[in-house]
Each structure stands twice: as structure tokens, then as C-alpha cells.
């Protein structure tokens, strides 16, 4: 979908030709004598329209308005969250139709236009319009081709617009790779996606194969991949936005491209959803896509340990002991607790980079789903400042997380008679004990763990990846920029140039 940011008064909006005009109506709408303001005032007065977020009123062929269809949508207090709810409702109504190719989203009625509200509106448009088509033989063409975002002025809107377009591209890439079936998203293919990102401004990609991984001593990662014929890959992405001497923020994404559970095999029901076990990796790819678009001034490294967890004839067995890259030995009591095994070696690798902070992202535990459901991701950290930064980013990006405990007492269950540590500690507090396991490998740097098992995808009729937590990660990274000297801007090719315009109208595609 193409997005265009355009300065339009309410009067000019009435003259804008479009298949649909979406108008967000907040509490305390200011009066006006243009056709749009009159229509909204009459609808509210008659009781046909509520300003509660998401409430809709459709009108067709309104006198004085050039658009074929007008959707008045309640936006409540006009907060970013209310704006998102309103736009989701409007886009849902448009998606049900067949003839909308060009739409105008009017934000002029909002009392104070915050950049965050503009971002929320555009991301909601992009996410609602997204449809997975990669493995369909006859994919339906997207109906909606252009969305004009109408504002009173660019001063407050431009920053939110630029950020939203970059974020939308990142979320879409994360969704695309997470939604792909496992045979279309193998570790090798995932590495190929990372190499494509390496063609974008400031991004470099390195892919390590089995021999290089073995040479590094990543025994835990190698152990997980023993049961599959698909070769494992260790993917390293580097975004270079600051001086080389500046320590990077490291993002680690769990990349289990399909998880059967191994010898500790999962139940057959809903096992197809285990293609989503690489959503952590997908979120790292998506975040790097957004970084390439926005070009912030900091250094970021992405690490993706990618492999399958299969019950082949060489698969690890319950009771096996393996040696991790750190030198610590691990007793594998449950082969379905494989995510922490690939992550622990990635954490040890991250220490070599002398990072300013490390954040790992993983669909790690069903226990986190039980604790937090699908609303908030679980946040664990050994550093207060890092945890606070991530929590703030979650709130500001509408991609929230919740801080979970890391008391040392939780580690008692990880003790082993046969190794330095066991990979599981029983059912009680499973999300916390998994994080305690990872913490053993993050003693030398500020570290946080995001358990996205409940937020990375949806089941049922709406089955599919959510693209979370790309929004959280991007806001977190942008918040780190002020402390880092920026490198000189990199000129992008026309296909990848960030959408930053000083003219009254800016066009871009997400």
C-alpha cells in the first residue's frame, strides 16, 4: 500500500476524490461550516454516531463531499491507543468491501495531532491491510492501493509518518517470514532473507554454517540441530549507524524454524503452529528492515541461531549432557526446552561484541502464555535501567510487556547431579526458570529477555503472526540514540530511501 502525507483543511478534504474517506471523530469535536463538519455534528446530535473508539457510521454519496463513501469513526480521547482502535474498525469495514482502491484518512479533527497518533494510525492501516499470499496458487490482489493521510500541517505529523512507514515495513517483513510454512522458511532460506537485508543501507550480513558453528564451540546449539537433515545457520546482522568504536545493542532472535519437541515430542494437535517458533528471529529481521528505513545513529547487531528441532535418529535424548560455548555443561532433561539451548550459545557469542546491552526475543515458554495471555510479552532483566527502557518502549509503541521476577530461589530447580545445570526445572514458574537458565550466560552485560510465546501469533480464525515485538524493539532502539554519536547519513537507492520529505506531500510504500 502507498502512503501519502498531505496537508489538507477540512474544506479541501471535501474536494478530495477517493473511494472512501475515513474521518476520526474525537470527543469535543470543534464546529465548522464545511460539509464534513456539518455531517459529523448532525450524526453526533442525532445519536447515530458515538465518539467511543471504534464506533462507526457509514454514509454514501454525501452532498458536498467528493469521496464515494464516508466513514465517521469515533476516536474517543484521541490518544494513540484510541486512534489505533478507530482505524482498525474503519479498515475492517473497508476490507469487507470490494471497490476501495484509494482512501483518505482524515486526522484533522483530532484536537492535538501527536506524532504517536499519526504512527498508530498508519501502522493500523498497514497491519489491517496485510494479507499473506506467498504460498497461495492464485493470490487475490490487494484492493486498497493508496492511503492519503490528511493533516492540518506537517510540523507534528512528519516525524510520526516517517517512523510509521519504517515500522510498517518491519512488521510486514516479520509477519511474512513468521507466517511461512516451515518448508518455505528453513534456516537456509531465513539466512537468505538476512542476506537480502544486507543490500540495504548500513546493514551487513554474515552467515555461519555447521563447520564455523562447531569451531566456535556452540555445543548446545549444535545438539538441538542433530535430529534434522536441515543444516543449521548462525546469522549475524550488523546495522552501522554510529562510530565503529561505539558499543552495539545486540538483539538475539530464537530461530527454531520448526519445533516438534524432538524426542520429547509435542502433541499432534496444533503442532502446525510450531512454524511460529522462529518469531523471535522474524522480529529481528523486521527490526533491521525498519532500521534501514529510518537510519538512526547507533550500532545494532542481530544474532539468529536458526535450526529445526526434530526427532531424527541422531537427535539428542533426555539425559544427554552437552557442553555450551561458555564451557558450562547442560543436562538435557527435556528436548522440547530447546530454545534456551540455542539462545545460551548466542548469548555467549554476544559477549564477544562488548555490547552496551543485549535483548533476546523468543517464543520460549507456554508458562508465559498462562501467566500473561496474548496481551503483554514477558520481560526479564538483570539491569534496572534496561528493563525500564524496554517497558517504556512497550507502552509508547502500543506493544506492551510486563516485568517478571528473577529471584535466585527460582534457580534451585535447575540443579543437576550430572552437569553444571539442567535445561528445565519442572512446571511451576516455568517462564521464570527458563529466564534463570538464560541469565547464567548473561552475567557479563546488561541483559533482557522477552518471552513472546503469547504475543507472537494468533490462533483460530485469525491465525497468523502479529509482527510483535518489532514496534517495541524499534522504540527501544530509537530511545538509545541520544547517547550515541551518529554516523554520517547513508544515501539510499530509490527503492530503499527513507520517507523523509520537506514538501507538503510525502509518498512512500509499506
Curated annotation (Swiss-Prot):
What is a single cellular component term in the Gene Ontology annotation?
A: cytoplasm
Q: Tell me the segments the record calls region Disordered.
A: 487-510
Instruction: Report whether Flavoprotein shows up as a keyword of the record.
Output: no
Which EC number(s) are documented for this chain?
3.4.11.1, 3.4.11.10
Question: Keyword set for this entry?
Answer: Aminopeptidase, Cytoplasm, Hydrolase, Manganese, Metal-binding, Protease
What remark does the entry make about the cofactor? Binds 2 manganese ions per subunit.
Cofactor entry: Mn(2+)
Location of this chain's protein in the cell: Cytoplasm
Q: Does Metal-binding count among this protein's keywords?
A: yes
Give the top-level enzyme category: hydrolase
Which positions does UniProt annotate for Mn(2+) 2 binding?
254, 259, 277, 338
Q: Which SUPFAM superfamilies match?
A: Macro domain-like, Zn-dependent exopeptidases
Query: Which residues catalyse the reaction?
Result: 266, 340
Which sequence ranges form a coiled-coil region, renumbered to this chain?
Answer: none
Task: Name the source's superkingdom.
Answer: Bacteria
- Binding positions for Mn(2+) 1 per the UniProt entry: 259, 336, 338
Q: What is its main location?
A: cytoplasm
The protein's matches in PROSITE patterns, at most eight in alphabetical order, are given as: CYTOSOL_AP
An annotated Gene Ontology molecular function: metalloaminopeptidase activity
Q: Which family does it belong to?
A: Belongs to the peptidase M17 family.
Q: Which NCBIfam families does this one have? A: PRK00913.1-4 (NF002074)
Function of the protein: Presumably involved in the processing and regular turnover of intracellular proteins. Catalyzes the removal of unsubstituted N-terminal amino acids from various peptides.
Q: What is this protein called?
A: Probable cytosol aminopeptidase
Organism, per UniProt?
Polaromonas naphthalenivorans (strain CJ2)
